[in-house]
Amino acid sequence: MLEINDFNAIRISLASPEDIRSWSHGEVTKPETINYRTLKPERDGLFCERIFGPTKDWECFCGKYKRVRYKGVVCDKCGVEVTRSKVRRERMGHINLASPVSHIWFVKGTPSRLGLLLDISPRNLERVLYFASYIIVEVKEDMLQVAREMIQEEYAARRQKIQKQAEEKRIELSTQLTQDLGGMETAQRSTQRQIEEEYRRLRDEIASEAEQLRERLEELSGTLADEDILFRGVTVVEEGEPINENTLDQLDELVEQELEVLEERRRRDLADAELLTDAERERKAYEATQEQERLQERLQRELDHLMREEKEKLEQLDTLKVGRIITETEYRQLRDIAPGVFRADMGAGAVRELIEKTVNLDKLAEELQAEIQSSQGQRRKKATKRLRVVEAFRKSGNRPEWMILTVLPVIPPDLRPMVQLDGGRFATSDLNDLYRRVINRNNRLKRLIELNAPEIIVRNEKRMLQEAVDALIDNGRRGRAVSGKGKHRLKSLSDMLKGKQGRFRQNLLGKRVDYSGRSVIVVGPNLQLHQCGLPKKMALELFKPFVMRRLVERGVAHNIKNAKRAVERVRPEVWDALEEVIKDYLVLLNRAPSLHRLSIQAFEAKLIEGSAIQLHPLVCAAFNADFDGDQMAVHVPLSRKAQEEARTRMLSKYNLLSPAHGEPIITPSQDIVLGCYYLTMVRDGAKGSGKRFSSIDEAMLAYEKHLLDIQAPIWIRMTGTLSGKSDRPVRELPLAADGTPRMLIETTIGRILLNNELQPPLRFRNRLIDKKGLKEIIADCYQYYTNLRNLSEDQLNEVRASHGNKHVQELARIYGSEMTAQQADRIKALGFRYATLGGMTIGIEDIEVPAKKYDIVREAEQLVADVEKQFRRGLITEEERYQEVVRIWQEATKQTIQAVKENLNPFGPVAMMSTSGARGNINQISQMAGMRGLMSDPTGRIIELPIKANFREGLSVLDYFVSTHGVRKGLADTALRTADAGYLTRRLVDVAQDVIITIEDCGTEEGLWLHGADDDELMEKLQVRMLGRILAAPIYHKETGELIADRNTEIDEELATAILASGQESVFVRSPLSCQAEHGLCRLCYGRNLATGKLVEIGEAVGIIAAQSIGEPGTQLTLRTFHTGGVASADDITQGLPRVQEIFEARVPKGKALLAEIDGVVQIVRDEEGVRTIRIVSTDVYTDEYPLGRGFSPTINHESEVYEGQVIAEGPGGAQIVTRLTGKAFIQGDRIIVSQEDHQERELVVPHNARIRVENGERVMAGQQLTDGSANPQELLELQGREAVQRYLVNEAQKVYRSQGVNINDKHIEVIVRQMLRRVRIEDPGDTGLLPGELIDSAEFRRLNNDIVSQGGDPATAATMLLGITKASLNTDSFLAAASFQETTRVLTDAAIQGKVDYLRGLKENVVIGKLIPAGTGIEKRIERPHEDLIGEMARMLEESQQAEEAPAETRRATPLPTPNGNKAPESDNDALLRARLEELLSGDGDNDQSDAEEEDNDLPAF
């Protein structure tokens, strides 16, 4: 039978309309929710019982069927199935949409998946979906051709008509001109006639006048004229002159002249008339020509216009392609041009139709592949993006048209509840409002379509439906968010998943749990390390069901109901039952914030009075708890397995070492330290000083008789040896009779008392014990008792009896933990006792102000006055003055601290507290007794006005005001830092949550070099760094060459000492950075588990441990640098938390250092403006030599330039020598030497405030730092490769933590850095089927390449990518983990399109779906073993068992193999089983054609 919850992968994909309908139990057609009078769900509404199931268990809507006996009956009256009401949490409905709508995730995401698939820009796609533009969905090709021909015919006819009209007009113009010219001829002749007649009349007039005058003159001839006689105004005879023959001649002359003038005028008039006629004729002819030309132009214009119009229309027809987007105007035009040729539409329906008709994924993939191969730059980038989407659809089996919804699922009503409030009003989930909007608009649209409403109204309603569905899926993604009453934004389905309040983070990754409580904590000084005090009232509530059961079992109550009553009334028997119950249970205590795994530990509960939880003082450090009002939560692990896990793994006494650095975390502190310090102090001159005793017992007797002071130095003879150095004299004595060493030592009673409390192997410690000393005792104790060599068989059997038959290493760990816990408890009791008896307390008298202080202050004031004087005189700048003043006061503060130190009474309580490490440090004492010194202002700049007073003297108002600045900044910084550190931890956990120890050995030959030369004041010593690592190569003695240790040996304390003693200064070790495990890490690359001091176990969640170890001390790091004012030098730009974030996010650092891009020689150049440039010049010279054989002669001259492939010498028979280089040729005797210089230059401009690290002429390597600051890790990766950047990131992170005194093992940082470098970017896909630019896991990449190479194909090439932790988290293989981290909608969109499968390998994804995490005890089921590994291992085991049988009886050791049912089989059966299984596996070799599906189901038992 298949277990429904037992699956090992989960897949997400797009839902088809058929899927949505198959999930549904009915269609929701009404927007109603519940009836306001009956308060029952409306039929066919959003809460309909017929669709979603009954609201009451086993009862139908109308009440016809009630009770469980009708289970499964569907009521014939109301249609409701009689079943449990909880089906309303799982039954879905659906809405049939009247018009398809797009799913906003696939439209508005970046990049728009729908847009990429259709090759439409997101803006255009949006215009189509929201009814602003049309998209062509169909073009009828045959009709298109007909339309083209019709247009061509129409325009041909129009051209013909225009040409015909133009011809007619031309003929008309020509005729008109001929007529006009003829008329002009006639008019000209008529004018000539008129002129002739006129002149004839004038001639006649002159002749007639002349005749009359002649007659008169003839009459008067011979007489004198009595007046002037005139002819036409000209005097012929003046008055008094005689009239004679001459007078007549004169008259004739005048007549002749007159006639000549007249004739001249006649000729002129005739000529003028002719000229006028000619001009008119020419004008007419010209006008006619112009008109003809105009006509011709107009004709041409009209023809051109027609041609253009025709061309445009034909072009528009040509652009009628399916998928083209057109505006409303263009649509109308095209519809007029080519009616019936095409169909265009708007909205999601059009897009869906387009996808169904045009998208052929296989063909599209081929086209895009070809384009990627042939194109460059932006086009290639776009094609790759498109291909990624196309391939996702192809491989996943999703259909692209499913991105457009035709059916909308309605989620179960109990997931969008509606509840009645006190006042009778209802509170409802926002989803109901959003669904109502969809249903209302959908119903309205259906009605409009039925009524055949105008297109514009239907279109508007479709757009509104699209917007309603958008708001339901992801409100606010497009346009204004839909808001409900009170203007609050309605929470859509996407909002239900996103963010801290979303489904993933609020309900799946963290839940509120039952059987828990919380209370204030108080100290429990009398508890043992594995105990806590639980208030009785609280315990009774937590264990109520168990107590009730126990009461029934004991017969105190007859049934559960009575038992419950007894518990509620708190009868005396209840406490006895509670005592019994609580014996078997451990409880978990948790203090928020849970920054690391030690924030939750298991304890045995001791019932106490009162209401506060009592906590053991030594576990406070792990919880980071104090007793100033802290609260803690209690949880009860319920199941047997949970209890067992709590007991074996979480009990506080088994969590003594910090997983971050492997040192004890239960170190005594405060009072305990003070008590032990007081106890081990030596006070010369105290009562009984210098006395001698023959034994410890004798000395103790003297002390008890009050003859000795507890701190008096006394001499004692004792047997045994000293543990560590002694701070008092020691004299060795002759050995005792049994050979034990003896000595005479100076010590004190206090030290004897302390040593009496130590385990025997840890004695005798004859020195002042401070906090560090106590830490050493705990560490030594754990180390001694967990080392198998120090344990006897009896001790191991003792553990076996109580903890079962476990592995000896595990038994040693348990024994060591228990012994250390006992030791810690004894020290605790001793410390508390003597802190009390010592009576050390601080009074105001203990704080003495040193007399020197006032001199120091006066001196400093004088120096400051001198500096001010120099500044006023202009000898120094304002900045220099400030720096000098700050320096003077810092020096004065330093001197004051020294003075306070010297002035302290070493036996005074203040000094004891400080020097023992119990509380406080010299700086704080100095603020009380010396001077407070300089303060920082809110920006972090130091205020140059110091506080010269101390708290003993009291601060003035100004002092107090100045000090508030720094204090306030400190508080604000702490608050900010906490949030930042929390977020950093979250990102680290996310990036490393799937790093689990999955296999024994990945078999890699790679590793990490640890160099002793790297030891500096910040880095740990080599001895510490190599502890717990596994050797990656054999290590030999430097001088003798003998093998010290082989590969894959764990370096423990002894081996580390031996390696250093052999003179080796560097060690090649395995590291998580180089682990080749396909999933998680292997045991050997990780090495020692720091929390146990033993090799890490399979199933350990080392990724999370690493993240917690780095994140937990994050709050201790400073937030920003305190600048000492002025320009910060580049090396102090970022420190503390921001620097850690910078490192793990792989950002370009602030104050970035310049790196050398090539190997070469440095030249530092400064231009006129003072800008510095570093030039790196690299000159490589290559030479090639060509010997000249017999008969060969050069064809070039000495020192001539030659190029590659040039003939440089010829020999007999046309033989030639050709050069392989381009450069200069030198002829030297019988050979030619060609020399080529490869010259490279790089110039880098140095920022004005950067300090240059290199000298002029210095040789540098690529990737070397040229200026101060932090290197950009991306550049480092490019220039020096993966190993350099790994080393850099680990060292940089360590520098930040170590500078703050935080100790973290390198291993943890390496785990994170490995995750940052896990991806590679494909450059050339080869035959792998990957896409260029795709990010892929490096293990997956190696596997694909190996498969391809084994099949004879071309492998892919790729570049290592360095991703920041946020990006790396989002790029994880698990979509559940990525979606629950950040950018939920984007992750789910991508995953759905790709049909991603989550194999549930990490922790988060298993927590999300509610399965046990594949770590710790949850991994046994999960260990994946490849087929070949299994066969190999079985073969090896078979061989071993055979060897064992052949071996002599005394050397034979039984190593029975667990059979599948967990029992141990007898040896012979075991062999038979192995052999049979092995043969079965090997026989399957020849017949290896099982389908993949069969192979997956054929799970092998995990042997």
From Swiss-Prot:
GO terms for biological process: DNA-templated transcription. DNA-dependent RNA polymerase catalyzes the transcription of DNA into RNA using the four ribonucleoside triphosphates as substrates. Zn(2+) 1 binds at residues 60, 62, 75, 78. Keywords: DNA-directed RNA polymerase, Magnesium, Metal-binding, Nucleotidyltransferase, Transcription, Transferase, Zinc. The RNAP catalytic core consists of 2 alpha, 1 beta, 1 beta' and 1 omega subunit. When a sigma factor is associated with the core the holoenzyme is formed, which can initiate transcription. SMART domains: RPOLA_N. Zn(2+) 2 binds at residues 1002, 1075, 1082, 1085. It is an enzyme of class 2 (transferase). Its cofactor is Mg(2+); Zn(2+). Its EC number is 2.7.7.6. Mg(2+) binds at residues 626, 628, 630. Belongs to the RNA polymerase beta' chain family. One of its GO terms (cellular component) is DNA-directed RNA polymerase complex. Residues 1439-1503 are annotated as: Disordered. This is DNA-directed RNA polymerase subunit beta'. It catalyses: RNA(n) + a ribonucleoside 5'-triphosphate = RNA(n+1) + diphosphate. GO terms for molecular function: DNA binding; DNA-directed RNA polymerase activity; magnesium ion binding; zinc ion binding. It holds the Pfam family RNA_pol_Rpb1_4. Binds 1 Mg(2+) ion per subunit. Binds 2 Zn(2+) ions per subunit. Residues 1486-1503 have a biased composition (Acidic residues).
